[in-house]
Amino acid sequence: TAVTLGGPGTLFWLWVTALIGMATKYSEVLLAVKFRERNKYGDWVGGPMYYIKNGLGKNWKWLGIIFCVFAALAALGTGNAIQAGNIVGSIHTAVLAFNPDFSGEATLNLVLGIVLAILAAVVLFGGVKRLGAVTEKLVPCMAVVYILACLAIILYNASSLPTVFHDIFVGAFTPNGVTGGAVGSMFLVISWGMKRGIFSNEAGLGTAPMAHATTSEREPVKQALYGIFEVFMDTIIICSLTGLTLLCSGIDLNYGVTGEISLVSEALGTLFTQKGGALVIAVALALFAFSTILGWALYGSRCCEFIFGSKAIRPYQVIYVLMIVVGATVDLEL
């Protein structure tokens, strides 16, 4: 979406956002670990609401509550329903690659939504330790598969890299010249680059620190360094590879129009065939998005716990699981 709506120059601003985001993520993770506390179950809990309360003082707890309200609501949409929609969308694209005449999208989406909800429920109701055990296995696997696939496309089209980087740096400041007039505003390029950068690495949102606060690491500075690496890996590596794959592959990018996940599948298909590209994207995106769903479930649960106490965690998780089905069956757009 960022590349098609903002042009190649969005990658430049994505990198700028990542550099700023590394410092932001470092700060918020450090504060989360420094000002965390134990809940009634003996688990570490932390995040913006806790370093507001424990760092600024209890008179500022109201600000932490406001943060929690918005974060818990965002978890249901951005961290849950949108991700479920991405999963079913990528799988539907893969199904069409193998069976172009397939017409049961609504039924497929409902079935996939129910399956995802059941899988999420099994993990979530197993507690924080099971959540960590699942995500620590999913993330490396999905990253390796996706990185290798993108690198293969980029190396296969290495001769186009000079032109691609020219378009990225020129398009960052004069988008009209590299998008055929489809994207004429530099502000639009900056906007899409920064929005997608923040959406991918969560730097400054205050959400990721809640996960970091659960660590057994006692030194805040050491844990905060992982926050820097997160932004680097997620945005500088993963997002950059996605953008370069699209730009190097030679596929037709309709600038100024919202792009679909099928574009990445099409780009990978230039080397791995259409079926192979669709399959890689379906698997990689399913793992990416599902781990995101699990992570945001923790964020929302922690926010409800801060406001209402531990008794609110389970009801929120039930609503969260049901929202997965909604996201899979209703057409939502970020």
PLM regions: where:
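Hydrophobic, small-residue-rich membrane helices and short re-entrant helix-turn-helix hairpins
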Residues: 48, 123-140, 160-165, 196, ...
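Helix-loop-helix module between adjacent transmembrane segments
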Residues: 20-42, 48-49, 53-85, 92-123, ...
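Extracellular/periplasmic helix-exit of transmembrane alpha-helices
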Residues: 28-35, 40, 150-167, 178-181, ...
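A generic transmembrane alpha-helix motif of multi-pass inner-membrane proteins
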Residues: 311-334
